[in-house]
Amino acid sequence: MIKPSLDQLMHLVDSKYTLVILAARRARDLQDGKHQMVESKSNKPVTIALEELAAGKLFFERGKPTPLG
C-alpha cells in the first residue's frame, strides 16, 4: 500500500492537479539539493515530497487570477 494515501493527501489540497504540481515542484527542489523536512525510508524525491505534504510541512497559496489582454 502506498503511504501516504491519496485520500489522506486530497484533504490537504483543493484538487488532484494542485497535488501533482506541488509534489513535482518539491521533488525538483529535493533533486537540486534542498534539505528534506521529514525523515523518510525512501530515496525517491516524489515520495519524500508527498510525505512532507502529509506531515504538514508543505503549504500552497492560490494566486489571484489576472485579466487577459
UniProtKB/Swiss-Prot annotation:
Highest taxon listed in the record's lineage: Bacteria
GO CC, any one term: DNA-directed RNA polymerase complex
One term of GO molecular function: DNA binding
Keyword Transcription: yes
Leading EC class: transferase
Gene3D superfamilies with a match to the protein in the record: 3.90.940.10
Function: Promotes RNA polymerase assembly. Latches the N- and C-terminal regions of the beta' subunit thereby facilitating its interaction with the beta and alpha subunits.
Assembly and binders: The RNAP catalytic core consists of 2 alpha, 1 beta, 1 beta' and 1 omega subunit. When a sigma factor is associated with the core the holoenzyme is formed, which can initiate transcription.
UniProt-recorded name of the protein: DNA-directed RNA polymerase subunit omega
